[in-house]
Swiss-Prot record:
The keyword Transport does not apply. It comes from the Eukaryota. Expressed during flower development in stamens and petals. Residues 1-61 form the MADS-box domain. Probable transcription factor involved in flower development. Gene3D superfamilies: Transcription factor, MADS-box. GO terms for biological process: flower development; positive regulation of transcription by RNA polymerase II; regulation of transcription by RNA polymerase II. Keywords: DNA-binding, Flowering, Nucleus, Transcription, Transcription regulation. Its main location: nucleus. Residues 84-174 form the K-box domain. It is found in: Nucleus. GO terms for molecular function: DNA-binding transcription factor activity, RNA polymerase II-specific; protein dimerization activity; RNA polymerase II cis-regulatory region sequence-specific DNA binding. This is Agamous-like MADS-box protein AP3.
């Protein structure tokens, strides 16, 4: 039974397409190798897959460059001359641009002005004034930014100073600020243990001011600790 004819069209499935490409590429390279051995032919094959991957085959008796050189000599064409001419044209254009830029730079530095006409000098003057204005505006912008940053730092320092003043003021208003009620154990407050050297301990008793004149007793009592 005869085999059905396979329709030649693009394989839509990417996996199947890559598998088919790999199989047929190997088959072509095998045929090229057979031509090289059986017929003493010089074969060069360059293949690019749909993913851009390069595959090539070259007969062991030659090189890719030799194949291209022989191709050019046989057909009488130069594959590289066109590209070389394009490169030379681009190089010339770049040199001209570079020359003009250097000339403009020297003119803006006050050099090579003798060949300029009055109109050209006026245009150059306007360009330099415009450039000077842009530089000056940028300078003022940088200065203003630095001033604003400095003002923010000053405001932060002033706020810290204000908070500290409020804290000290609160301490002055609160008579018991920082005192610890430990039941009269002044030795533990002062950090002395039994058997230490005699010291005078200050006992603070918040009695009314009138007691000073009534003879009840002073709010300051000195006790000798032994």
């Amino acid at each position: 039974m005869a085999r059905g004819k396979i329709e030649i069209k693009r394989i839509e499935n990417s996996t199947n397409r890559q598998v088919t490409y790999s199989k047929r590429r190997n088959g072509i390279f095998k045929k090229a190798s057979e031509l090289t051995v059986l017929c003493d032919a010089k074969v060069s094959i360059i293949m690019l897959s749909s993913t851009g991957k390069l595959h090539e085959y070259i007969s062991p008796s030659t090189t890719t460059k030799q194949i291209f050189d022989q191709y050019q000599n046989t057909l009488g064409v130069d594959l590289w001359s066109y590209h070389y001419e394009r490169m030379q044209e681009n190089l010339k254009k770049l040199k001209d641009v570079n020359k003009n830029l250097r000339k403009e730079i020297r003119q803006r530095m006050g050099e090579h002005l003798s060949d300029l006409s009055v109109e050209e000098l006026r245009d150059l003057e306007q360009e330099m004034e415009s450039s000077l204005k842009m530089v000056r505006d940028r300078k003022y912008q940088v200065i203003n930014n630095q001033i604003e940053t400095f003002k923010k730092k000053v405001r932060n320092v002033e706020q810290i100073h204000k908070n500290l003043l409020h804290e000290f003021d609160a301490r002055d208003r609160d008579q018991h600020y920082g005192l610890v009620d430990n039941g009269g154990d002044y030795e533990s407050v002062l950090g002395f243990s039994n058997g230490s050297s005699p010291v005078f301990a200050l006992s603070l008793q918040p009695n009314p001011p009138n007691d000073l004149h009534s003879g009840v007793g002073s709010d300051l009592t000195f006790t000798l600790l032994e």
